[in-house]
């Protein structure tokens, strides 16, 4: 397994403390990797800063060609990436191969094209005797912090727009799941000029803090928890760095009486539990209207109970383990607290799976109330709550009564209602009669404490640029 860092175009061993990397399906140590030292963090940022003077002025075509080469290389090594991701995250291998790797490749190819299609206000004489034009230039050195739930995909979401726009990047994957990012570093080394892309390994306090706080870093992009986002915003405030934050969610799934109940059941079974529920857009907070609620509890409970947990390499496995022992304990605690309330009914699941690895049973909790922590706080596991509602106004108020604002869905056959709800839900994305669908052409990002800034789409590309006005007197 590739365990070296990429700094200034060279693969080097970390000079810091060694950290274990686990297989969450077994709890066994896969390998130990040495963190970047403080000197190596500094070297990576300064290499990126030096490279920016040239990379930032390359043509969009040249940058696009590099991204297309990287996409091709990932596609050629798809099985290697999939196996690393499966081993390091516990994801079912067939899901990584069929869903995640193609999506990663598509993101790089999309931004390769988007780099050549930026547009803006037309140049013109908005003041007599003066011609104005708008430039959209790269920001500079971007520090990117990727999460542990989709390590390779989130790295792609950060690298592709930043590099396409002409920035240079120093990326730190999660210390829990670094293997695919380090493999990516090995393959990208000969595609990009030295210093354009740098990949580090280490914990937040030893590598993340000196990276995000570095004087030469002009922008920090994070996908992570609210707590981590708060820390980075505070840590970088004195240097007024641009920040780009995607900080989690608690997606409401609003099911009206006229919804296609079978479609809802299939949707929640799939999109509430994909990646063991470790997804900030997971369909985890169901509000069902009183007419459909009892039947939905029964049907969904039966469907969720059929989800198969198991070894990631088994093609019949649908639900892998949680990412770490610590996260398994957090999920156990959240469910135990809900059960202790008395009014929450465990329809199915509700406890960890005995044996090796960090597995938790697919869980459906009915009877949850709006004020319950299981409704209000992100669990980030295979746990879905159900709450009964009366009418449109009540459920709209409840859905928006959340610190999160990333994703939501509405299930109804009434087109007018779908439009009304979509217009008033305070979420970065609202799906109607589906959930979890993402495409490279459309933006993904949150509101409220779910953060700000967009991933994917031309809006994501624009987030990694600065707008400049040039006026010429004549």
Swiss-Prot record:
Any one GO MF annotation of this record: NAD binding
Keywords assigned by UniProt, alphabetized: NAD, Oxidoreductase
- The record lists the membrane-crossing segments as none
Q: Which Gene3D superfamilies match?
A: Aldehyde Dehydrogenase, Chain A, domain 1, Aldehyde Dehydrogenase, Chain A, domain 2
Record-linked InterPro entries: Ald_DH/histidinol_DH, Ald_DH_C, Ald_DH_CS_GLU, Ald_DH_N, Aldehyde_DH_dom, Aminobutyraldehyde_DH, PatD
UniProt pathway annotation: Amine and polyamine degradation; putrescine degradation; 4-aminobutanoate from 4-aminobutanal: step 1/1; Amino-acid degradation
**Which residues participate directly in catalysis?**
246, 280 (nucleophile)
Keyword Oxidoreductase attached: yes
Task: Tell me which SUPFAM superfamilies the record gives.
Answer: ALDH-like
Q: What is its EC number?
A: 1.2.1.19, 1.2.1.-
| Catalytic reaction(s) noted | 4-aminobutanal + NAD(+) + H2O = 4-aminobutanoate + NADH + 2 H(+); 5-aminopentanal + NAD(+) + H2O = 5-aminopentanoate + NADH + 2 H(+)
What's the domain of life for this entry? Answer: Bacteria
Residue positions annotated to bind NAD(+) are: 146-148, 172-175, 209, 225-228, 280
Q: Which GO terms describe its biological process?
A: L-lysine catabolic process; putrescine catabolic process
PANTHER family per record: ALDEHYDE DEHYDROGENASE-RELATED
Q: Assembly state and interactors? A: Homotetramer.
Its biological purpose is as follows: Catalyzes the oxidation 4-aminobutanal (gamma-aminobutyraldehyde) to 4-aminobutanoate (gamma-aminobutyrate or GABA). This is the second step in one of two pathways for putrescine degradation, where putrescine is converted into 4-aminobutanoate via 4-aminobutanal. Also functions as a 5-aminopentanal dehydrogenase in a a L-lysine degradation pathway to succinate that proceeds via cadaverine, glutarate and L-2-hydroxyglutarate.
Instruction: State the family named in the UniProt similarity comment for this chain.
Output: Belongs to the aldehyde dehydrogenase family. Gamma-aminobutyraldehyde dehydrogenase subfamily.
Any other noteworthy remark?
Answer: 4-aminobutanal can spontaneously cyclize to 1-pyrroline, and 5-aminopentanal to 1-piperideine.
What name appears for this protein in its UniProt entry? Gamma-aminobutyraldehyde dehydrogenase
Which species is this UniProt entry from? Enterobacter sp. (strain 638)
Chain's gene name: patD
């Amino acid at each position: 397994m590739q365990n070296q860092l990429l700094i200034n175009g060279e693969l080097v061993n970390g000079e810091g403390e060694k950290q274990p990397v686990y297989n969450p399906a077994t709890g066994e140590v896969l390998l130990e990797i040495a963190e970047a030292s403080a000197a190596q963090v500094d070297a990576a940022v300064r290499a990126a800063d030096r490279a920016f003077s040239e990379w930032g002025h390359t043509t969009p075509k040249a940058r696009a060609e590099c991204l297309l080469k990287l996409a091709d290389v990932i596609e050629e090594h798809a099985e290697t990436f999939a196996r690393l991701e499966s081993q390091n995250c516990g994801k079912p291998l067939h899901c990584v191969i069929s869903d995640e790797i193609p999506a990663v490749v598509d993101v790089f190819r999309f931004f390769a094209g988007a780099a050549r299609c930026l547009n803006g206000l037309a140049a013109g004489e908005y003041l007599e005797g003066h011609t104005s034009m708008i430039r959209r230039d790269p920001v500079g050195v971007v520090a990117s912090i990727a999460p542990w739930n989709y390590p390779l995909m989130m790295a792609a979401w950060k690298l592709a727009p930043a590099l396409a726009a002409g920035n240079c990047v120093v990326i730190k994957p999660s210390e829990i799941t670094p293997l695919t990012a380090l493999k990516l570093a090995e393959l990208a080394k000969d595609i990009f000029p030295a210093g354009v892309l740098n990949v580090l390994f280490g914990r937040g306090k030893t590598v993340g803090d000196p990276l995000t706080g570095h004087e030469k870093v002009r922008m920090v992009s994070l996908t992570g928890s609210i707590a981590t986002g708060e820390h980075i915003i505070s840590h970088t405030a004195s240097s007024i760095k641009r920040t780009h934050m995607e900080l989690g969610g608690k997606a409401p799934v609003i099911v009206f009486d006229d919804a296609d109940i079978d479609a809802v059941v299939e949707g929640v079974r799939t999109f509430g539990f994909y990646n063991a529920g470790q997804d900030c857009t997971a369909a985890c907070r169901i509000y069902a209207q009183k007419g459909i609620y009892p039947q939905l509890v029964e049907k969904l409970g039966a469907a969720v109970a059929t989800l198969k947990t198991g070894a990631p390499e088994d093609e019949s496995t649908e639900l892998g383990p949680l990412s770490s022992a610590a996260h398994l304990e957090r999920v156990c605690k959240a469910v135990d607290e809900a059960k202790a309330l008395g009014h929450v009914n465990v329809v199915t699941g509700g406890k960890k799976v005995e044996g090796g690895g960090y597995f938790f049973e697919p869980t459906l909790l009915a009877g949850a109330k709006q004020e319950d922590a299981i409704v209000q706080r992100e669990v980030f596991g295979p746990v879905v709550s159900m709450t009964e509602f009366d009418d449109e106004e009540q459920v709209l108020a409840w859905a928006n009564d959340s610190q999160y604002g990333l994703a939501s869905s509405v299930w109804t056959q009434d087109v007018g209602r779908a439009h009304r709800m979509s217009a008033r839900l305070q979420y970065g994305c609202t799906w109607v009669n589906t959930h979890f669908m993402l495409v490279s052409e459309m933006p993904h990002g949150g509101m409220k404490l779910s953060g700000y800034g967009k991933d994917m789409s031309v809006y994501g590309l624009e987030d990694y640029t600065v707008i400049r006005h040039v006026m010429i007197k004549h």
